[in-house]
Amino acid sequence: QDLEDEGHLPVRIYASFDEFPNLPFRTGLGNEKVRYGYYKIYVDGSLGGRGAYFSEPYNDAPEICGAMIHTPEEIEELVRRANNMGLQIGVHCIGDKAIDCVVSAIEKAYAENPRPDARFRLIHVLGINKELIERCKKLPVMFDIQPKFLSSDVHWAEDRLGPERSSYGFAWKKLIYAGFVETGSSDCHEEPYN
């Protein structure tokens, strides 16, 4: 904000945050250059580190399914609280089991408080499948995908997930044809921003 006030900010910033604010707050506060965006929740780990949480083990590590950062109950509470505060929500969820937990939490929170301005951003979603896509169609969900993953992850994703699961991992066209809004991001600092 100081750089913007001094006229030295050449870009627009839409900042996410991962802690609840202690003051009255809502998504969209700010100005043309610096605006508060969504409340971000991390649900599982990365595909590369085999931390993304899947319902079935990794193809190349049959003893591992990944891990959740929060319990399903904690995810439900975080999503419910953020939705009731009027915040947009962004959720890092890669594996199908993680996405399932998030979609279940959104279904409950949105049924409880169907705000007209609600927007739930699912980030990465490499483990999405047809059933999850159908459930998402009934919700104000959008997808935040990372085109850079096509050059960094696509070469080993099939070995990690197997052909069936990896067929949806980069199937962004399927999401567009299903009627979803997609945004692209760099996933910087994990990937270069250019």
Regions found by a protein language model. Give the residues of each.
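Active-site gating/metal-coordination segments in enzymes
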Residues: 18-80, 123-125
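Short acidic/histidine-rich active-site segments
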Residues: 47-50, 87-97, 145-147, 175-194
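Glycine-enriched alpha-helix->loop->beta-strand junction motifs that scaffold or abut catalytic
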Residues: 32-33, 109, 135-144, 178-181
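Histidine/acidic-residue-rich catalytic or RNA/ligand-binding cores of hydrolases
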Residues: 99-107, 134, 153-160, 188-194
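C-terminal helical cap
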Residues: 119-120, 130, 152-153, 157-182, ...
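Hydrophobic faces of well-ordered beta-strands that scaffold small-molecule active sites
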Residues: 11-18, 37-43, 89-91, 120-123, ...
